[in-house]
Amino acid sequence: MISRYINGLGIALVIVIWGVTFASTRALLVDFSSFEILVLRFSLAWVALWGIERLRGSANVGKWRNEWIFAAMGFTGIVAYQFLENCAIYYTNASNVAILVSFGPIVTALMARALTKDRQLSARLVGGSLISICGVSLVSLNGIVEFELRPIGDVMALCAMASWGLYSILIDEANERGINPLVAVRKSFGWSLIMMIPVAIWGMTESGICALDGSFAVIVDAGVNVERFSNLINWMNIAFLGLLASAASFVLWSVVCRIFGVVKTTISLYLTPIVGVIFAAVFLGEDITILEVVGGGVILIGVAIATTVKGGVK
Protein backbone atom coordinates (compact mmCIF):
# COMPACT_ATOMS: atom_id res chain seq x y z
CA MET A 1 0.00 0.00 0.00
CA ILE A 2 2.82 2.40 0.92
CA SER A 3 4.55 1.76 -2.39
CA ARG A 4 1.34 2.60 -4.26
CA TYR A 5 1.10 5.92 -2.44
CA ILE A 6 4.73 6.63 -3.30
CA ASN A 7 4.03 5.84 -6.94
CA GLY A 8 0.96 8.08 -6.74
CA LEU A 9 3.21 10.87 -5.54
CA GLY A 10 5.38 10.15 -8.57
CA ILE A 11 2.43 10.85 -10.86
CA ALA A 12 1.67 14.04 -8.91
CA LEU A 13 5.28 15.18 -9.27
CA VAL A 14 5.23 14.68 -13.04
CA ILE A 15 1.94 16.58 -13.35
CA VAL A 16 3.32 19.49 -11.31
CA ILE A 17 6.48 19.64 -13.42
CA TRP A 18 4.60 19.43 -16.73
CA GLY A 19 2.13 22.04 -15.48
CA VAL A 20 5.01 24.47 -14.99
CA THR A 21 6.57 23.82 -18.41
CA PHE A 22 4.12 26.21 -20.08
CA ALA A 23 5.46 29.17 -18.10
CA SER A 24 9.08 28.08 -18.54
CA THR A 25 8.66 27.65 -22.29
CA ARG A 26 6.90 31.00 -22.56
CA ALA A 27 9.87 32.69 -20.91
CA LEU A 28 12.30 31.07 -23.37
CA LEU A 29 10.20 32.05 -26.39
CA VAL A 30 11.44 35.62 -25.91
CA ASP A 31 14.89 34.57 -27.17
CA PHE A 32 14.38 31.15 -28.81
CA SER A 33 12.05 29.60 -31.37
CA SER A 34 9.79 26.70 -30.40
CA PHE A 35 11.97 24.32 -32.41
CA GLU A 36 15.21 25.52 -30.80
CA ILE A 37 13.68 24.99 -27.36
CA LEU A 38 12.65 21.49 -28.37
CA VAL A 39 16.16 20.59 -29.58
CA LEU A 40 17.90 22.11 -26.54
CA ARG A 41 15.50 20.46 -24.14
CA PHE A 42 15.77 16.92 -25.45
CA SER A 43 19.50 17.16 -26.24
CA LEU A 44 20.19 18.02 -22.61
CA ALA A 45 17.83 15.27 -21.49
CA TRP A 46 19.59 12.70 -23.70
CA VAL A 47 23.01 13.68 -22.33
CA ALA A 48 21.76 13.47 -18.74
CA LEU A 49 20.23 10.02 -19.21
CA TRP A 50 23.30 8.79 -21.10
CA GLY A 51 25.47 9.92 -18.18
CA ILE A 52 23.26 8.11 -15.67
CA GLU A 53 23.40 4.95 -17.78
CA ARG A 54 27.19 5.07 -17.86
CA LEU A 55 27.32 5.47 -14.08
CA ARG A 56 24.91 2.59 -13.54
CA GLY A 57 26.44 0.36 -16.18
CA SER A 58 25.00 -0.55 -19.58
CA ALA A 59 21.51 -2.03 -19.45
CA ASN A 60 20.36 -4.93 -21.58
CA VAL A 61 17.99 -3.61 -24.27
CA GLY A 62 17.91 -6.69 -26.48
CA LYS A 63 20.43 -5.35 -29.01
CA TRP A 64 18.67 -4.08 -32.13
CA ARG A 65 15.39 -5.95 -31.88
CA ASN A 66 13.78 -3.21 -29.78
CA GLU A 67 15.04 -0.23 -31.77
CA TRP A 68 11.79 0.09 -33.69
CA ILE A 69 9.98 0.68 -30.40
CA PHE A 70 12.42 3.41 -29.38
CA ALA A 71 12.22 5.06 -32.80
CA ALA A 72 8.42 4.93 -32.74
CA MET A 73 8.37 6.38 -29.22
CA GLY A 74 10.63 9.21 -30.34
CA PHE A 75 8.42 9.96 -33.32
CA THR A 76 5.00 9.74 -31.63
CA GLY A 77 5.75 11.14 -28.18
CA ILE A 78 8.18 13.89 -29.12
CA VAL A 79 8.50 14.77 -32.81
CA ALA A 80 4.90 14.30 -33.99
CA TYR A 81 3.23 15.37 -30.74
CA GLN A 82 5.30 18.52 -30.23
CA PHE A 83 5.27 19.59 -33.88
CA LEU A 84 1.54 18.99 -34.32
CA GLU A 85 0.65 20.83 -31.13
CA ASN A 86 2.86 23.83 -32.00
CA CYS A 87 1.46 24.00 -35.53
CA ALA A 88 -2.09 23.57 -34.26
CA ILE A 89 -1.73 26.64 -32.04
CA TYR A 90 -0.63 28.61 -35.11
CA TYR A 91 -3.65 27.60 -37.21
CA THR A 92 -6.25 27.71 -34.43
CA ASN A 93 -6.38 29.21 -30.93
CA ALA A 94 -4.88 27.86 -27.71
CA SER A 95 -8.32 27.16 -26.22
CA ASN A 96 -9.28 24.89 -29.12
CA VAL A 97 -6.01 22.98 -28.74
CA ALA A 98 -6.38 22.58 -24.97
CA ILE A 99 -9.94 21.30 -25.26
CA LEU A 100 -9.31 18.93 -28.17
CA VAL A 101 -6.11 17.49 -26.64
CA SER A 102 -8.02 16.87 -23.40
CA PHE A 103 -9.83 14.02 -25.18
CA GLY A 104 -6.47 12.21 -25.14
CA PRO A 105 -7.11 9.93 -22.14
CA ILE A 106 -10.32 8.56 -23.67
CA VAL A 107 -8.60 7.95 -27.00
CA THR A 108 -5.67 6.32 -25.18
CA ALA A 109 -8.12 4.05 -23.32
CA LEU A 110 -9.73 3.01 -26.61
CA MET A 111 -6.32 2.37 -28.19
CA ALA A 112 -5.14 0.42 -25.16
CA ARG A 113 -8.25 -1.75 -25.20
CA ALA A 114 -7.83 -2.48 -28.91
CA LEU A 115 -4.06 -2.94 -29.05
CA THR A 116 -2.91 -4.10 -25.60
CA LYS A 117 -3.96 -6.18 -22.61
CA ASP A 118 -5.06 -3.04 -20.74
CA ARG A 119 -8.81 -3.36 -20.10
CA GLN A 120 -9.37 -0.38 -17.79
CA LEU A 121 -11.97 1.25 -20.08
CA SER A 122 -15.25 1.52 -18.16
CA ALA A 123 -18.36 3.68 -17.93
CA ARG A 124 -16.93 5.43 -14.86
CA LEU A 125 -13.68 6.18 -16.66
CA VAL A 126 -15.47 7.61 -19.70
CA GLY A 127 -17.92 9.57 -17.55
CA GLY A 128 -15.18 10.96 -15.33
CA SER A 129 -13.12 11.90 -18.37
CA LEU A 130 -16.04 13.78 -19.94
CA ILE A 131 -16.57 15.69 -16.68
CA SER A 132 -12.86 16.56 -16.59
CA ILE A 133 -13.03 17.74 -20.20
CA CYS A 134 -15.80 20.15 -19.15
CA GLY A 135 -13.49 21.43 -16.42
CA VAL A 136 -10.61 21.86 -18.86
CA SER A 137 -12.96 23.80 -21.15
CA LEU A 138 -13.89 26.18 -18.32
CA VAL A 139 -10.24 26.79 -17.45
CA SER A 140 -9.18 27.18 -21.09
CA LEU A 141 -12.01 29.41 -22.30
CA ASN A 142 -12.14 31.32 -18.98
CA GLY A 143 -15.39 33.10 -19.79
CA ILE A 144 -14.46 33.94 -23.37
CA VAL A 145 -16.62 32.04 -25.83
CA GLU A 146 -14.04 31.63 -28.58
CA PHE A 147 -14.25 27.97 -29.49
CA GLU A 148 -14.94 27.79 -33.19
CA LEU A 149 -14.00 25.08 -35.61
CA ARG A 150 -10.85 25.85 -37.58
CA PRO A 151 -10.31 22.65 -39.58
CA ILE A 152 -6.55 22.71 -40.20
CA GLY A 153 -5.51 23.56 -36.65
CA ASP A 154 -8.21 21.44 -35.03
CA VAL A 155 -7.25 18.37 -37.06
CA MET A 156 -3.61 18.92 -36.07
CA ALA A 157 -4.64 19.09 -32.40
CA LEU A 158 -6.58 15.84 -32.75
CA CYS A 159 -3.59 14.20 -34.45
CA ALA A 160 -1.34 15.39 -31.61
CA MET A 161 -3.73 13.78 -29.14
CA ALA A 162 -3.73 10.52 -31.11
CA SER A 163 0.06 10.63 -31.34
CA TRP A 164 0.39 10.81 -27.55
CA GLY A 165 -2.04 7.90 -27.29
CA LEU A 166 0.21 5.82 -29.55
CA TYR A 167 3.23 6.85 -27.46
CA SER A 168 1.44 5.56 -24.37
CA ILE A 169 0.77 2.23 -26.09
CA LEU A 170 4.45 1.98 -27.03
CA ILE A 171 5.40 2.61 -23.40
CA ASP A 172 3.19 -0.33 -22.50
CA GLU A 173 4.93 -2.48 -25.13
CA ALA A 174 8.38 -1.51 -23.81
CA ASN A 175 7.28 -2.29 -20.25
CA GLU A 176 5.85 -5.66 -21.35
CA ARG A 177 9.26 -6.54 -22.81
CA GLY A 178 10.94 -5.68 -19.52
CA ILE A 179 12.98 -2.83 -21.00
CA ASN A 180 14.49 -0.46 -18.45
CA PRO A 181 12.42 2.78 -18.64
CA LEU A 182 15.59 4.88 -18.45
CA VAL A 183 17.02 3.10 -21.48
CA ALA A 184 13.77 3.26 -23.45
CA VAL A 185 13.32 6.98 -22.82
CA ARG A 186 16.95 7.85 -23.54
CA LYS A 187 16.91 5.95 -26.83
CA SER A 188 13.58 7.51 -27.84
CA PHE A 189 15.09 10.95 -27.22
CA GLY A 190 18.06 10.03 -29.40
CA TRP A 191 15.84 8.90 -32.25
CA SER A 192 13.72 12.05 -31.99
CA LEU A 193 16.81 14.25 -32.27
CA ILE A 194 17.95 12.34 -35.36
CA MET A 195 14.51 12.87 -36.91
CA MET A 196 14.77 16.60 -36.20
CA ILE A 197 17.98 17.06 -38.22
CA PRO A 198 16.22 17.75 -41.56
CA VAL A 199 13.96 20.28 -39.83
CA ALA A 200 16.99 21.95 -38.24
CA ILE A 201 18.68 22.31 -41.64
CA TRP A 202 15.47 23.73 -43.11
CA GLY A 203 15.13 26.08 -40.13
CA MET A 204 18.37 27.80 -41.13
CA THR A 205 16.98 28.72 -44.55
CA GLU A 206 14.91 31.81 -45.28
CA SER A 207 11.70 29.81 -45.74
CA GLY A 208 12.28 27.91 -42.51
CA ILE A 209 12.99 31.07 -40.54
CA CYS A 210 9.77 32.68 -41.78
CA ALA A 211 7.51 29.62 -41.41
CA LEU A 212 4.78 29.81 -38.74
CA ASP A 213 6.01 33.16 -37.42
CA GLY A 214 9.50 31.79 -36.82
CA SER A 215 8.44 28.68 -34.88
CA PHE A 216 11.02 26.55 -36.72
CA ALA A 217 13.78 29.15 -37.04
CA VAL A 218 17.34 28.13 -36.14
CA ILE A 219 19.50 31.18 -35.49
CA VAL A 220 23.20 30.76 -36.31
CA ASP A 221 24.23 34.41 -35.85
CA ALA A 222 27.14 34.42 -33.36
CA GLY A 223 26.20 37.74 -31.78
CA VAL A 224 22.62 36.70 -31.13
CA ASN A 225 23.70 33.34 -29.72
CA VAL A 226 26.27 34.87 -27.37
CA GLU A 227 23.64 37.22 -26.00
CA ARG A 228 20.89 34.67 -25.43
CA PHE A 229 23.16 31.88 -24.16
CA SER A 230 24.85 34.22 -21.69
CA ASN A 231 21.51 34.79 -19.96
CA LEU A 232 21.41 32.82 -16.69
CA ILE A 233 17.60 32.77 -16.61
CA ASN A 234 17.56 31.15 -20.04
CA TRP A 235 19.93 28.44 -18.82
CA MET A 236 17.79 27.85 -15.72
CA ASN A 237 14.70 27.36 -17.89
CA ILE A 238 16.57 25.11 -20.33
CA ALA A 239 17.87 23.05 -17.40
CA PHE A 240 14.37 22.75 -15.95
CA LEU A 241 12.87 21.64 -19.27
CA GLY A 242 15.73 19.27 -20.09
CA LEU A 243 16.51 17.68 -16.73
CA LEU A 244 13.17 17.74 -14.92
CA ALA A 245 10.41 18.09 -17.54
CA SER A 246 12.07 15.71 -20.01
CA ALA A 247 14.69 13.36 -18.55
CA ALA A 248 13.22 12.80 -15.08
CA SER A 249 9.53 13.16 -15.93
CA PHE A 250 9.48 10.92 -19.01
CA VAL A 251 11.30 8.14 -17.13
CA LEU A 252 9.03 8.50 -14.10
CA TRP A 253 5.98 8.53 -16.37
CA SER A 254 7.08 5.24 -17.92
CA VAL A 255 7.58 3.74 -14.46
CA VAL A 256 4.14 4.69 -13.17
CA CYS A 257 2.55 3.50 -16.44
CA ARG A 258 4.08 0.09 -15.72
CA ILE A 259 2.54 0.08 -12.23
CA PHE A 260 -0.90 1.63 -12.77
CA GLY A 261 -1.39 1.00 -16.50
CA VAL A 262 -1.28 3.61 -19.26
CA VAL A 263 -5.00 4.41 -19.08
CA LYS A 264 -5.23 5.29 -15.41
CA THR A 265 -1.93 7.15 -15.53
CA THR A 266 -2.99 9.20 -18.55
CA ILE A 267 -6.16 10.30 -16.73
CA SER A 268 -3.94 12.32 -14.38
CA LEU A 269 -3.02 14.64 -17.28
CA TYR A 270 -6.34 16.40 -16.70
CA LEU A 271 -4.74 17.95 -13.61
CA THR A 272 -2.06 19.80 -15.63
CA PRO A 273 -4.19 22.94 -16.30
CA ILE A 274 -4.81 23.33 -12.56
CA VAL A 275 -1.07 23.34 -11.87
CA GLY A 276 -0.51 25.82 -14.70
CA VAL A 277 -3.11 28.24 -13.32
CA ILE A 278 -1.73 28.03 -9.76
CA PHE A 279 1.87 28.52 -10.92
CA ALA A 280 0.91 31.51 -13.08
CA ALA A 281 -0.87 33.09 -10.11
CA VAL A 282 1.91 32.49 -7.56
CA PHE A 283 4.99 33.19 -9.68
CA LEU A 284 3.75 35.32 -12.59
CA GLY A 285 1.21 37.43 -10.72
CA GLU A 286 -1.73 36.43 -12.92
CA ASP A 287 -5.23 36.56 -11.43
CA ILE A 288 -7.23 33.40 -10.79
CA THR A 289 -10.81 33.82 -11.98
CA ILE A 290 -13.98 32.26 -10.60
CA LEU A 291 -14.34 30.17 -13.76
CA GLU A 292 -10.82 28.77 -13.30
CA VAL A 293 -11.64 27.81 -9.71
CA VAL A 294 -14.91 26.16 -10.78
CA GLY A 295 -13.17 24.48 -13.72
CA GLY A 296 -10.45 23.16 -11.43
CA GLY A 297 -13.07 21.72 -9.09
CA VAL A 298 -14.88 20.05 -11.98
CA ILE A 299 -11.58 18.52 -13.18
CA LEU A 300 -10.88 17.11 -9.71
CA ILE A 301 -14.36 15.58 -9.51
CA GLY A 302 -13.95 14.03 -12.96
CA VAL A 303 -10.54 12.55 -12.13
CA ALA A 304 -11.87 11.16 -8.84
CA ILE A 305 -14.75 9.44 -10.66
CA ALA A 306 -12.55 8.13 -13.47
CA THR A 307 -9.97 6.58 -11.15
CA THR A 308 -12.27 4.90 -8.64
CA VAL A 309 -14.40 1.79 -8.62
CA LYS A 310 -17.32 0.89 -6.38
CA GLY A 311 -15.03 -0.31 -3.64
CA GLY A 312 -12.77 2.76 -3.72
CA VAL A 313 -9.67 3.84 -5.57
CA LYS A 314 -8.20 1.23 -7.90
Spans of model-derived segments:
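C-terminal-most transmembrane helix of multi-pass membrane proteins
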Residues: 1-2, 9, 42-43, 51, ...
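Glycine-/small-residue-enriched transmembrane alpha-helix faces in small-molecule transporters
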Residues: 1-39, 75, 147-176, 194-201, ...
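Juxtamembrane helix-entry segments on the extracytoplasmic side of multipass membrane proteins
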Residues: 3-8, 31-35, 39, 62-68, ...
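Specific transmembrane alpha-helical segments of multi-pass solute transporters/efflux pumps
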Residues: 17, 21-22, 50-101, 134, ...
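Helix-helix packing/entry segments at the starts of transmembrane helices
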Residues: 40, 82, 95-103, 170-194, ...
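Hydrophobic transmembrane alpha-helices of multi-pass small-molecule transport proteins
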Residues: 49, 71, 111, 121-143, ...
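Transmembrane alpha-helical segments that form core, pore/gating elements
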Residues: 49, 108-110, 146-219, 252
